């Protein structure tokens, strides 16, 4: 048996440098309640590690048709582009690592097939700015995404190092950001037309 615990790369201590964070990078679990709860999950896993084989997957920003919770950036922009007259973002400069849901699932399956136990980062190993994502939404929706240019909370740049994941599995993402966002955008459009969106889907 193997237990998999999903936490977050937000555990890593923020820094101004553009170097990616590997699994040995120092953590800061006291950023907020969400991050601290993930830290507690990891501590429980460590306590039982000798009796329960486990993997701790520190996830980057996973997006896709079934990841529709606000205030996550991509689902929020898509929802607003369908239902609002104006679309805006807090600031277009921050860069984060975004991974499509199907790619994340493939990576998880690939890792299960190994004998590895311990911590591993889950992401694409590359960053994309909020501005670049806004441009994709503009092309799909025909609506301009306004930059409010407000002060950014948190680091401007956050990337996880996925070298360990690749070394263990050889896994690489199949979907580009454009492809993943387009698939998500179209699926949410179908749900909207079928009266399943936004209330029944976005709040689930």
Where do the PLM segments sit?
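Hydrophobic alpha-helix immediately C-terminal to the catalytic Tyr-X-X-X-Lys motif of short-chain
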Residues: 40, 44, 48, 77, ...
């Amino acid at each position: 048996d193997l237990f998999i615990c999903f936490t977050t790369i937000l555990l890593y201590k923020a820094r101004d440098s553009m170097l990616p964070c590997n699994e040995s990078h120092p953590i800061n679990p006291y950023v907020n309640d969400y991050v601290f709860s993930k830290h507690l999950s990891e501590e429980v896993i460590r306590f039982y590690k000798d009796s329960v084989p486990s993997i701790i997957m520190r996830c980057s920003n996973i997006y896709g048709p079934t990841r529709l919770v606000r205030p996550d950036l991509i689902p929020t922009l898509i929802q607003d582009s369908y239902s609002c007259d104006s679309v805006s973002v807090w600031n277009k400069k921050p860069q984060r690592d975004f991974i499509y849901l199907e790619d994340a699932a493939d990576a998880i399956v690939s890792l299960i097939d190994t004998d590895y136990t311990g911590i591993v980062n889950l992401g694409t190993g590359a960053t994309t700015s909020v501005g670049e994502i806004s441009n994709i939404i503009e092309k799909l929706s025909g609506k301009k995404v306004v930059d409010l240019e407000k002060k950014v909370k948190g680091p401007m740049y956050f990337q996880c190092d996925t070298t360990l994941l690749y070394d263990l599995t050889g896994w690489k993402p199949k979907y580009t950001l454009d492809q993943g966002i387009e698939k998500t955008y179209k699926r949410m459009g179908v749900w909207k037309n079928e009266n399943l969106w936004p209330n029944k889907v976005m709040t689930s």
